[in-house]
Swiss-Prot record:
Xref: SUPFAM superfamilies: Glyceraldehyde-3-phosphate dehydrogenase-like, C-terminal domain (SSF55347), NAD(P)-binding Rossmann-fold domains (SSF51735)
The protein's role, per its UniProt record: Catalyzes the rate-limiting step of the oxidative pentose-phosphate pathway, which represents a route for the dissimilation of carbohydrates besides glycolysis. The main function of this enzyme is to provide reducing power (NADPH) and pentose phosphates for fatty acid and nucleic acid synthesis which are involved in membrane synthesis and cell division.
The gene coding this protein: G6PD6
Residues engaged in binding NADP(+) 1: 38-45, 73, 155, 182
Active-site residues from the entry: 274
Protein known as: Glucose-6-phosphate 1-dehydrogenase 6, cytoplasmic
UniProt note: pH dependence: Optimum pH is 8.0.
Gene3D superfamilies for this protein: Dihydrodipicolinate Reductase, domain 2, NAD(P)-binding Rossmann-like Domain
Xref: InterPro entries: G6P_DH (IPR001282), G6P_DH_AS (IPR019796), G6P_DH_C (IPR022675), G6P_DH_NAD-bd (IPR022674), NAD(P)-bd_dom_sf (IPR036291)
UniProt pathway: Carbohydrate degradation; pentose phosphate pathway; D-ribulose 5-phosphate from D-glucose 6-phosphate (oxidative stage): step 1/3
Length: 515
């Protein structure tokens, strides 16, 4: 945009308080017990506890109501758990944060025990009940939120123990909810088996299948962008859009997680869940309301419209050196890179390729959505070689969105040049802290809002799309192509994009605006 001074406007915001009333998402009071199962693991330390601390600092967790319980097999004390997570929460040199941290850590109690025996969960229930008795009076309810920061293999036994020993028993009302992390199975059969095992114990309204991509700021912005802006409505279809890319790139490899990653691969790890969820929001029809079930109904409909994936529209890759990890088999075919084209058979999207691309050890780190529009018919300026209009939504890092367009280059001649209209969140929303995805989603579970969580039928259809391809990969029928770390990935992937109709703008680089 130029190098001059930026003027940051102050604009009014509209807070839709009627939303919570209309859709039954109402604030609750009373004792809130948050139980982090797998409390000594990396996920809990790096994501769950930091999200809880940030919610506490912002006033969303009332210290007069909430208590946090860690549960794991590791035999440690309350203070040892606090010491383990302390360094992941704040820089203690900040006096204000250090004071908040000290108060937050005092809310945490630890219980150790196995995941498949009642004895440990009975002690956990006793600790929770003591907290509830100390906090509750004649008013209020008892709410229990179980966050399973655990591998899916132990979900069935843990859920059975929760159901047997740890359900909310208050006569004053309240609820018991569970949060489960991906991966939800490895294919359709295992996902359905897992869903059945959990579904026999809990109602769907109690189950929150978390996909942290649905908590990202610009992913949550998709419905607002699409359905609250008039100029997008007539353009968002096959008559105007040439192709859609949803991209996830990392500039590092598996880094010590090779054995775990090799069981799943990049499609199970990223594409079948994160990128497919983004596709739903880009491609779905307008829901009749913002009720969570209405939104999730439309996501299921668009997934049901995806046609089977053709091997001709898939490129797999594996970066050189991946098998050097001692935990990875020498003959592994597991892809660390994949580009696959999905096609949606409906009136809006017939003929438009949705290109889902993800990879590790590439030349950059970013996640973005690229909506590329069709060429202008009757190009009187002869500028099509400069590139098409493209609407780009940068999910990470440095959240932003920009529209690539052709304009007249300043000067006496009639020359055209590619430029952009852009919105960089760091520049536009200075001083506004953008919440982490886990903060939003944990708060949603407390509120009882399932809009940003995956429903069972949605999960089933997602696996139906990818399971046939995954089984062919597992059998070695689709091979991974070697690529150099730090590259764009296999050259065959670029050839597939070109075949699908994607036109790259050579020489154009978007530069985020600076103050």
């Amino acid at each position: 945009m130029g190098s001059g001074q930026w003027h940051v406007e102050k604009r009014s915001t509209f807070r839709n308080d009627s939303f919570v009333r209309e859709y039954g998402i109402v604030p609750e009071t009373g004792c809130l017990s948050i139980i982090v199962l797998g409390a000594s693991g990396d996920l809990a330390k790096k994501k769950t506890f930091p999200a809880l601390f940030n919610l506490y600092r912002q006033g969303f967790l009332n210290p007069d109501e909430v208590h946090i319980f860690g549960y794991a097999r590791t035999k440690i004390s309350d203070e040892e758990l606090r010491d383990r997570i302390r360094g992941y929460l704040v820089d203690e040199k900040n006096a204000e944060q250090a004071e908040a941290l000290s108060k937050f850590l005092q809310l945490i109690k630890y219980v150790s025990g196995p995941y498949d025996a009642e004895e440990g969960f009975q002690r956990l229930d006793k600790a929770i009940s003591e907290h509830e008795i100390s906090k509750n009076s004649t008013e209020g309810s008892s709410r229990r939120l179980f966050y399973l920061a655990l591998p899916p293999s132990v979900y069935p036994s843990v859920c059975k123990m929760i159901k047997t020993c740890c359900m909310n028993k208050s006569d004053l009302g309240g609820w018991t909810r569970i949060v489960v992390e991906k991966p939800f199975g490895k294919d359709l059969e295992s996902a359905e088996q897992l869903s059945s095992q959990i579904g026999e114990l809990f109602d769907e309204s109690q189950i929150y299948r978390i996909d942290h991509y649905l908590g990202k700021e610009l992913v949550q912005n998709m419905l607002v962008l699409r359905f609250a802006n008039r100029f997008f409505l007539p353009l968002w279809n096959r008559d105007n859009i040439e192709n859609v890319q949803i991209v996830f790139r990392e500039d590092f490899g598996t880094e010590g997680r090779g054995g775990y990653f090799d069981e799943y691969g990049i499609i199970r790890d990223i594409i079948q869940n994160h990128l497919l969820q983004v596709l739903c929001l880009v491609a779905m029809e307008k829901p009749i309301s913002l009720k969570p079930e209405h939104i999730r109904d439309e996501k299921v409909k668009v997934l049901q419209s995806v046609v089977p994936i053709s091997d001709d529209e898939v490129v797999l890759g594996q970066y050189e050196g991946y098998r050097d990890d001692d935990t990875v088999p020498n003959d592994s075919n597991t892809p660390t890179f994949a580009t696959t084209i999905l096609r949606i058979h409906n009136e809006r999207w017939e003929g438009v390729p949705f290109i889902l691309k993800a990879g590790k050890a590439l030349n950059s780190r970013k996640a973005e959505i690229r909506i590329q529009f069709k060429d202008v018919p009757g190009d009187i300026f002869r500028c099509q070689k400069q590139g098409r209009n493209e609407f780009v939504i940068r999910l990470q890092p440095s959240e932003a969105m920009y529209m690539k367009l052709t304009v007249k280059q300043p000067g006496l001649d009639m020359n055209t040049v590619q430029s952009e209209l852009d919105l960089s969140y760091g520049q536009r929303y200075q001083g506004v802290a953008i919440p982490e995805a886990y903060e939003r989603l944990i708060l949603d579970t407390i509120k009882g809002d399932q809009q940003h969580f995956v429903r069972r039928d949605e999960l089933k259809v997602a696996w139906e799309i990818f399971t046939p391809l995954l089984h062919r990969i597992d059998k070695g029928e689709v091979k991974s192509i070697p690529y150099k770390p730090g590259s764009r990935g296999p050259k065959e992937a670029d050839q597939l994009l070109e075949k699908a109709g994607y036109l790259q703008t050579h020489g154009y680089i978007w530069i985020p605006p600076t103050l």
